[in-house]
């Protein structure tokens, strides 16, 4: 029984978000860590993410049944009813937002709510099914966790938080396009208009390369504005350039497109994990305090 209630929350997505929210929190803490606040932020946001995923599974039952990758989800194979998944998601969301509201600040809660509404309301219910821009809309919600972590610790939205939001939003694009390429048949069967399906793999390749290049530029803004040190700059440039070189290999004659897309996808995870860990460790002790919107 417990297993299906865990599976419906997409634990892999939760774990990925744990790393980014912790990275944002440690970056903003600048060595002065409130461990109770950190724990409450991580648990609270994890529950909010779990809630969104459970409700996403409830809404997506029809298209999940058409995709090889998702047809065995508990909401599709009958192990869990849609009603149970929905109310499970509601309970998790209430607890998660309650924790964030009690322990953090209105800025962090507002961004968590923004991400939730975008993911469940805009992305899941409309853009994923109807628009090629669904990936971009989804990327907005996917970029929220590190910003929530940052704002929970800093008590404000500043240039550092803005850079994190932009950086993680851009990162989502090549990451998601790569998935859409090697899962092309699934998305086509479900009628989901992701870029490779609706406008072709060639265009998706170009977008992957452009977004990786943009990601490298935005990631460099954190050290250039004084939020992190040279160590982050080195890791950011090394991983971004390697990722870009990997993406450019997609133009080699006779390339196995699915294999190439999987490599781009897996390295995207390595890149964002490396940067999340590095920004947690290589912070500057004094914040530049640029573009400040305080919580108090």
Curated annotation (Swiss-Prot):
GO MF: protoheme IX farnesyltransferase activity
GO cellular component terms, semicolon-separated: plasma membrane
Chain segments annotated as coiled-coil in the UniProt record: none
Alphabetized Pfam families for the sequence: UbiA (PF01040)
GO biological process terms held by the UniProt record: heme O biosynthetic process
UniProt pathway: Porphyrin-containing compound metabolism; heme O biosynthesis; heme O from protoheme: step 1/1
Topology in membrane: Multi-pass membrane protein
Function: Converts heme B (protoheme IX) to heme O by substitution of the vinyl group on carbon 2 of heme B porphyrin ring with a hydroxyethyl farnesyl side group.
Misc. comment: Carbon 2 of the heme B porphyrin ring is defined according to the Fischer nomenclature.
Annotated HAMAP family: CyoE_CtaB
Protein name stated in the entry: Protoheme IX farnesyltransferase
Organism, scientific name: Marinomonas sp. (strain MWYL1)
Gene (name only): cyoE
